[in-house]
Design a protein with these regions (language model features):
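Short glycine-/acidic-enriched loop or helix-start segments at secondary-structure transitions
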Residues: 18-19, 40, 93-96, 119-120, ...
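Catalytic-core segments of class I nucleotidyltransferases/pyrophosphorylases
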Residues: 99-100, 129-216
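Conserved beta-loop-beta/alpha segment of the NTase-like Rossmann-fold superfamily
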Residues: 57-124
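Residues at the starts of beta-strands that form the adenosine-phosphate
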Residues: 3-5, 49-52, 81, 106-107, ...
Length: 216
């Protein structure tokens, strides 16, 4: 069985939530009375996996998600699987099946139908193999949920390290995951699109709408 490390990068400022009056760190904001990060951890941790939340208390302020992950690289088995999950999403899926599918290729990415301009998007062929990933540009109706699996952690980490060393920055000048994935695609890695119903909790409005659906 593939050893899997789960990493939840959570060193961002959560600026939109703080501007809306939230006084706790974004990962600790309650979602139906349960901290956001706790819900994500319970949802994305495969059987037998080791999970880490990489927050500012561990790595300090960082320059984007890739930077956060690389600063915690010592926690990751480079020859095992790596599952990365952003803290502001909820996906309706069976995580063990997701990992199983990812292991038939070089990895897999959770996707869902959307046209929101603040997300990343992919193109995929008829077999579900991703051919392109673009950040903050609606190039298809297949959005990235924020959950990624790589069969060999080393391959993603090598790509992430190259992006940072070459100072290839994305949205708001940050080192973003989509850049590392785009590099992997250019180098011939096969990553699969795994469709699943997804709720994005990236803004206060997203959170309020989600909680309203469950409490009204």
């Amino acid at each position: 069985m593939t050893r899997v490390t789960v990493v939840i990068p959570a060193a961002g400022e959560g600026r939109r939530f703080s501007e809306a009056g939230y006084t706790v760190a974004k990962p600790l904001i309650p979602v139906l009375d349960v901290p956001m990060v706790q819900r994500v951890l319970a949802n994305v941790t495969p059987t037998g996996a080791t999970a880490f939340v990489v927050g500012r208390d561990l790595v300090g302020a960082t320059e984007g998600t890739l930077d956060t992950i690389l600063r915690a690289e010592r926690l990751i088995d480079p020859e095992g699987g790596l599952l990365i999950a952003l803290v502001d999403q909820l996906v309706d899926f069976a995580v063990d099946d997701f990992v199983k599918v990812g292991n038939t290729a070089d990895g897999a990415i959770i996707t869902f139908a959307s046209r929101r301009p603040d997300l990343s998007y992919v193109d995929a062929d008829d077999q579900g193999v991703i051919t392109r990933i673009v950040d903050k540009e609606v190039v298809s109706d297949t959005a990235v949920a924020g959950v990624y699996y790589f069969r060999r952690a080393r391959e993603f980490l090598d790509s992430a390290r190259s992006i940072v060393l070459n100072e290839e920055r994305g949205y708001r000048g940050e080192y973003v995951i989509s850049l590392a994935i785009a590099r992997m695609l250019r180098r011939g890695y096969r990553l699969l699109s795994y469709l699943a119903e997804t709720t994005i909790l990236g803004t206060p409005e997203d959170l309020w709408e989600y909680e309203k659906r469950w409490t009204w």
